[in-house]
Amino acid sequence: MEQLLHYVWKHKLFPLSPLHTTDHRQVEVIDPGLHNRNTGPDFFNAKIKIDGMLWVGNIEIHDKASDWYLHGHEKDERYDNVVLHVCGIIDLEARNSKGEPLTQMQLSIPENVLRHYQELLSIDQYPPCYQIIPALTRLSVHSWMSALQTERLSQKTEAIAERVKKCNGDWEYAYFVTLARNYGFGINGEAFEQWALSIPLHSVDHHRDDLFQIEAIFLGQAGLLELSTIPERYQKDALNDGYFSKLRNEYLYLQHKFSLAPIDYKLWRFLRLRPQNFPHIRISQLANLYFRRQASLSHLLEATTVKEVIGVLKTSVTPYWETHYTFGSESIRNEKHISPFSLNLLIINTVIPILFAYGRHRGEEKYCDRAFEFLEELKAENNHIVRMWQQCGLEVENAGDSQALIQLKKEYCDKKECLRCRIGYEYLKRK
């Protein structure tokens, strides 16, 4: 409950009068102070009046007064300028490192705030706060959605910055790895990232003009050219499959040449995966993209509109995969172009974060601005999270909105971070 006490104090969600210290002096809260999330007192530079006298200093908040000693504050000089010790329960007198007694005040959590908080924590299908969404002003919703959108983009930027470190500062390589990860479309994202990191692009570049060799390296590094990785019912046909044999022999030669180590085939997940999303198909599409030099960051940076980006990312499989989903099993011919739906997701999860991260890194605002422009122009995602919020009454007009709502669900609702949510705040302060 200490976290909730912090919240009640920060937002002054308590009756402003009468408030009294344990020795019956009247307290008036003018400014609750600046919330400190690091070590030290909980609130800095608060302004309070005690019996009419103004005090400026720090506030410490605990469930029980005895927590002061439990946390060792009586030995810590940083807590000597605490002007008020606010507690849910006062069970003893507390003193600072100088031996001076603290001014203490009991603060109860208002019944309505406690009730609403418990409702928020008992989330089932919908967060209970959805009831107040229709009553929120358009401005407050727009402001919160904008903040969530930026927060989500910043999180993705941090992930890309870490990827750039793994790639020794090579942004082209980091872009390829990010693109590959998102070709996994969630289920195989981690496997695709490990696969991309296993490919030494500087070496592969020597064979960039040969699509067959690129596909051999790409499929070989995925562990997909081993006979044991092919379903048993197709293995006999795969042995008689000339393309499989040629790819395998070419990979063995290139593996030796570049000392390549493939990833573990078991990383790939096939259960409940549509054949269109099989790693073989996605890797062939990436090989084609790489061969046409469309998988390069420099090429992407030249694209100034969504239409141009789509032109950069459009790809299909090599001829063999038009009639196959796996080795040794022929299927009806299908060119297997990457779908508009998948392109939309790739731009949202790859292109936009890369533009934003690269723009920040280089201090070039035009790329950051372009990222936000693309978010406003692209269609919203259509998934269970977005549909849930739409049913709750929130309007979803573009990809920026859907990204904001995914951030809200994953980082606030799922983690029970209602006290950091602006909708949660409106819900808690209701009577």
How should each PLM-predicted stretch be described?
Residues 403-431:
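Cysteine-cluster motifs in flexible loop/terminal segments that predominantly coordinate metals
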Residues 32-37, 45-50, 67-75, 90-96, ...:
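Catalytic micro-motifs at enzyme active sites that drive phosphoryl/nucleotidyl and oxygen chemistry
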